[in-house]
């Protein structure tokens, strides 16, 4: 079977289960694609060729013995450089961590592996996932957007998005605390899921025995990237569940009760009223039309709840938590790599103890306001990033660039802050670059987001896999 890397994850797994292709052949096909494409885009940082072939051979033996090999049998996936894979360094893109070998798989890696999927490589990130939105690490260099090398692939899960978009992997495992799955998905023309806080188990004790602070515990969620919504759904069904390493993860059903009547969708093309690029506005309009055609009750809404207040609280809480570690982190980021965070630290001073207590109360109140909004409108349609893909490093260039990027990702930031699920889905091309939208839902109603994203995809199409251009 030729060019197995062009197949969907669902088709790849089905081909392995039927015996049309072996898992080893599937992995080898992706390794050949990586050898062909990765030198041009620099997305895969650590290739796990021998480990992947060994895992694939075990899957083939299971099938030969009559044992079901799993819903993702043989499907290759990449893993963000921040997420442990047993026996492989977890570098965060930092030379100092090049020998930090993981002793066990992170919970989401373990769940994908248990479903038959095969980790094939780590994928690039911004240094320490803190050097900015562009995927450039001190250890591995720049990752290139396959649609246009003059535009960023986004971040911080940019390596996974590029790997999936170019067919080097069928799935990518990233994480998102303010757009880090969804923005690369838009910029690279793939689909991405940020789940509800507590939907997927995780363990972010990577650099030592201590857990992160409360903001990191609440904001960071692991999430998959895929070329189609159907593949995203497969990954969602596998990743959801509980794990004793993560007391936040809840045993909530994958699918909620059907809603009566047509599902209402609130459309907010310009959240916060700060402006939106015409191409992105057109993408939101196209997705709204697709949902109307699919029978959704689509309504224009003035704005989302408490946008400015949420952005301010997000910034102050995260800076306050981060401030004690800033001197050490600044050294790890190195000259130039610290500019993005340094500007944030200068602009937003840490809160006092009393201020932090009040901010935590504000956080709960904002979450309540969003729960009430989504009780009336079970889905929200809006932009992922309010511009097409921007130039690499814009956010680190100067204060104006940082402000522009912060404004562009504002809906991602706020939806991470309130812990609700969102699916990014492509809508087409504008001037040769991918456009997309996100569908945001009630807490633990990822199924509603996926259903609506599928309706958009069915009417507007899939953009990838793509060969690198330029």
Spans of model-derived segments:
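An N-terminal boundary/leader segment
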Residues: 1-54, 293-295, 465-470
């Amino acid at each position: 079977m030729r060019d197995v890397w062009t197949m969907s994850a669902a088709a790849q797994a089905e081909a392995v289960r039927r015996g049309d292709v072996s898992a080893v052949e599937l992995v080898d096909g992706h390794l050949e694609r990586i050898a062909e494409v990765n030198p041009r885009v620099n997305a895969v940082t650590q290739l796990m060729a021998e480990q992947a072939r060994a895992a694939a051979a075990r899957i083939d033996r299971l099938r030969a013995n009559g044992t079901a090999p799993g819903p993702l049998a043989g499907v290759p996936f990449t893993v963000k450089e921040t997420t442990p894979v047993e026996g492989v360094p977890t570098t965060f893109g930092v030379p100092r961590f090049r020998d930090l070998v993981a002793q066990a798989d992170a919970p989401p890696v373990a769940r994908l592996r248990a479903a038959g999927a095969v980790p094939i490589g780590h994928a690039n990130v911004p240094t320490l996932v803190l050097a900015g939105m562009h995927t450039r690490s001190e250890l591995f260099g720049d990752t290139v957007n396959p649609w246009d090398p003059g535009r960023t692939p986004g971040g911080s899960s940019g390596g996974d998005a590029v790997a999936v978009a170019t067919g080097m992997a069928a799935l990518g495992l990233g994480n998102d605390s303010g757009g880090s799955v969804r923005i690369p998905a838009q910029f690279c023309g793939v689909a991405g899921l940020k789940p509800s806080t507590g939907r997927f188990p995780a363990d972010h004790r990577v650099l030592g025995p201590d857990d992160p602070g409360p903001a990191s515990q609440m904001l960071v969620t692991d999430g998959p990237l895929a070329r189609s919504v159907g593949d995203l759904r497969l990954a969602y069904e596998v990743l959801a569940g509980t794990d004793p390493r993560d007391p936040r993860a809840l045993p909530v059903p994958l699918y909620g009760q059907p809603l009566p009547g047509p599902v209402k969708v609130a459309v907010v093309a310009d959240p916060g009223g700060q402006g939106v690029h015409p191409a992105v506005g057109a993408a939101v309009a196209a997705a709204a039309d697709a949902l109307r055609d699919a029978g959704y009750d689509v309504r224009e809404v003035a704005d989302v709840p408490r946008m400015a207040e949420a952005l301010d609280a997000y910034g102050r809480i995260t800076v306050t938590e981060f401030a004690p570690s800033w001197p050490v982190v600044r050294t790890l980021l190195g000259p130039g790599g610290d500019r993005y965070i340094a500007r944030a630290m200068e602009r937003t001073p840490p809160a006092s103890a009393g201020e932090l207590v009040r901010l935590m109360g504000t956080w709960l109140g904002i979450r309540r306001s969003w729960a009430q909004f989504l009780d009336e409108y079970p889905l929200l349609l809006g932009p992922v990033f309010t511009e097409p893909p921007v130039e690499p490093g814009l956010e680190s260039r100067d204060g104006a660039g940082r402000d522009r990027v912060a404004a562009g990702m504002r809906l991602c930031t706020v939806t991470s802050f309130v812990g609700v699920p969102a699916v990014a889905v492509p809508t087409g091309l504008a001037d040769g670059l991918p456009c997309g939208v996100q569908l945001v839902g009630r807490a633990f109603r990822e199924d509603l987001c996926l259903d609506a994203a599928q309706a958009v995809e069915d009417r507007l199409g899939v953009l990838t896999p793509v060969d690198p251009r330029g």
